[in-house]
Amino acid sequence: MNKCRFLSKNEEYRNIYQNGRSIASRYFVVYYLKNEDEKKLPSFGISVSKKIGKAVVRNRLRRRLKEALKRLCFEFLPGYDYVIIPRLSFKNDEFSVILEQLLYIIKLMKRSIDNA
């Protein structure tokens, strides 16, 4: 089974921010950009603002979000790179709420891409 890829380079994040599209919900802002290889699994980046809290809180949030992305990796459209930015309202929610909100944002993105 293939694993999801996570972005690691600053240039990758910058490229998605500058050239990609964004969609927002109550819990997330997601930037997405079509990559060169349409068959490739999606790549994810997670950016947690210092407004969320101190490092311990941000890292816990990042770990929970990363696990949710691993579980839902195949729900995302292949051939796209994503940067996910959790909002402050996301901080103390249960894992099931995180999964539910990610599925909701995936649905919004698919609808947005189909309309474009």
Swiss-Prot record:
PROSITE patterns: RIBONUCLEASE_P (PS00648). The keyword Ribonucleoprotein does not apply. GO terms for biological process: tRNA 5'-leader removal. Belongs to the RnpA family. RNaseP catalyzes the removal of the 5'-leader sequence from pre-tRNA to produce the mature 5'-terminus. It can also cleave other RNA substrates such as 4.5S RNA. The protein component plays an auxiliary but essential role in vivo by binding to the 5'-leader sequence and broadening the substrate specificity of the ribozyme. Consists of a catalytic RNA component (M1 or rnpB) and a protein subunit. This is Ribonuclease P protein component. It comes from Carboxydothermus hydrogenoformans (strain ATCC BAA-161 / DSM 6008 / Z-2901). The lineage of its organism: Bacteria, Bacillati, Bacillota, Clostridia, Thermoanaerobacterales.
